[in-house]
Amino acid sequence: TLQLICPFAAGGDSDANARWAAQYLTQEMGMDVVVVNTDGNGGAVGARAAKDSPNDGSVALISSSAFITNELSGAIDFGLDEFEFSCICAENPGNIVCVNKDLGVNTFQELIDYSKANPGKLKMAYNSGATTHAIALQIIDAGVDATLVDAGGSSDRIAALLGGHVDIIINSFGSVKDYLQSGDFVGLGLTGDRDAENIPDYKSLKEQGFDVAFPTYFFIAFPKGTDPELPKKVSRAMKNIIENNQEYAAAIKDAYMQSPTYYDGEKGKQKLLESREEIIKYTSAFQSK
């Protein structure tokens, strides 16, 4: 049996991607692959649990770009070099920046203008040390005057915006699409590094000309010292699933508007390190929270 440690609670897109990987790897590799949710501290608890697991091939980490913000915030004191990297196995098409319809703001530029006309008034929710923390800091750099509020995980941030406790949230598109359709929330732009083919109604903030982008990748990595053949074998199996399995492609599109995304070992690790470079300038802000 291979245990995939997912460092986030059940119910979000990290957990969903872990479960898809486990389900299809079980079929593809002919062995039992199961998900173990070990959440806490924005992903740090599970990352440490995976790092400290035996390197006998029985355990791997399936995490997201939050690993990078964990490292920069000091929530973990180790990086990707403490793992045998297997592959990037998925990509979230970007979070979406949302405001409550009552704010009367319909574009990101209008949000900047409103915030400048009302300094200190707006509150923006984020999850400390997670990817939304990085994006929130980029939004402030882009000219939005807002106070940051650590409002916890995805569903907590939605509740805070619905209840009027905060004015701006950054959430995965799948988690807020019902509120966008009902008109309760207004979406101002996606935070991936390009437009998302499965979300045609919203453009990325980057394509709109704003320097706000932090792609969320999901990756699989094994504890250091694991026989390097195993991460390669898992990577090859994921490649086959991602490139050829129609059922998988339909599932990720229906749930989170994802398109099949795969990067092998070195290329995958490079992608994560590139996005780390984008936000390394925020290290002191992450640590001062």
Protein language model regions, located:
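Membrane-helix entry/capping segments
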Residues: L162, K267-E274
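N-terminal (or domain-start) structured segment
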Residues: T1-E82, K121, A130-T132, D141-I170, ...
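A ligand-binding cleft/hinge motif common to bilobed small-molecule-binding domains
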Residues: S65-I76, A134-A142, I168-D201
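Short coil/turn segments
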Residues: A9-G11, S65-A66, N100-V105, Y126-T131, ...
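Hinge/capping helix and adjacent helix->loop/strand transition within the periplasmic-binding protein
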Residues: L2, L25, A49-S58, L72-D156, ...
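C-terminal lobe and pocket-closing loops
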Residues: V176-A249, E274-E277
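A short gly/proline-enriched turn/hairpin at secondary-structure junctions
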Residues: L205, T261-D264
